[in-house]
């Protein structure tokens, strides 16, 4: 009788350990999901602020007879423009203008990367299109 009780007790302990590990793994995955989603929403909000800062800076440059977009410069922005944007937004993200409409004087595409998040903005057919991606580094040599 003691042997049977001991076997049943061991099985119950094993089952409890397995269930505990499965529940713990579930909560780890759930925690990481919400952490990544929160970071993505934060990056998206910052990218919307980048868009507003680019528009504001372009209006200011228009008054000076210049353009915020400089295709011959790295990231499509002068160092002064990049510093101004980072000063306005108080962040350390990287902004790269990918397209610009000189007739309407608006930025029609840019990417904003902060941490492991990359936000892509494209203005097409009078609508704003946003993509938020989480970047995973697979190899570092």
Predicted regions and their residues:
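Extracellular/periplasmic head regions of type IV pilus-like filament subunits
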Residues: 64-127, 137-141
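Amphipathic alpha-helical segments typified by the pilin-like N-terminal helix
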Residues: 9-51
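Short amphipathic alpha-helical patches
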Residues: 16, 57, 62, 73-74
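N-terminal polybasic/positive-inside topogenic patches
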Residues: 130-131
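N-terminal Lys/Arg-rich, disordered targeting/topogenic segments
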Residues: 1-9
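N-terminal alpha-helical signal peptides/signal-anchor transmembrane segments
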Residues: 46-65
